[in-house]
Amino acid sequence: DDRPLLILVSQSGETADTLAALREAKRKGARILSITNVVGSSIARESDDVFYTWAGPEVAVASTKAYTTQLIAFYMVALNMAIKKGTITKEKYFEVLDELKTLSGKVESLLEDIEAEKSIAQRIKEKSSLFYLGRGADYQTALEGSLKLKEISYIFTEAFAAGELKHGTIALIEEGTPVVAIATQKDLVEKMISNIKEVKARGAYVYAITTEGETEIKKVADEVIYVPETLDLLK
């Protein structure tokens, strides 16, 4: 099949603009792969191939299950494309698959003790604004974290690419501004430490999120939340 491939994502499978894009792409000869949660939805019916996330109904206001399962779906698609194209080895392929299976257990272990997170929530709930920083894949997590906080707390919050900090962003930081700095990518920790120092020089109070075993972040951040280590591909 030499048709161009369009990958669409829609939790409901009924998103109007996504459905319009699907129909236009099909009209122009594209093959459609959709990632959706709802069996029998319009997007699922009109796609050539469907990857169901099977996340079930979203009970919380914030769409956490759908987002997480969509990420995993994208990983699975990318992994299978990579193995077919020969850009990763079979050993690496199965290593990532095996690690994927451990993620739910790691999340459960993280949720066993959330006293630190509760304490932080109590302190930031009266703040008028909060900023997230991240580099690479951590920037995408920062964007999602910012969105979730907006949706459920009604606090003004924005996420910024830490590498662009000097281009206007840092001017928003003032004394006492809470900043969440996400630094789980080992090769980017050093640069994130520099960013943390920059915002702290402006008076920010920094909550860092990093992986277990990382020792340098705590020397510059005000507080640190540790998450379980995993493959860089899955962070």
Positions of predicted regions on the chain:
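Glycine-rich phosphate-binding loops that contact phosphosugars or nucleotide phosphates
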Residues: 1-102, 182-224, 230
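Extended hydrophobic-aromatic, low-complexity segments
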Residues: 15-19, 119-120, 140-144, 151-152, ...
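Active-site phosphate/pyrophosphate-binding segments
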Residues: 49-178
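A signal for specific C-terminal beta-sheet/loop modules enriched in small/flexible residues
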Residues: 154, 226-227
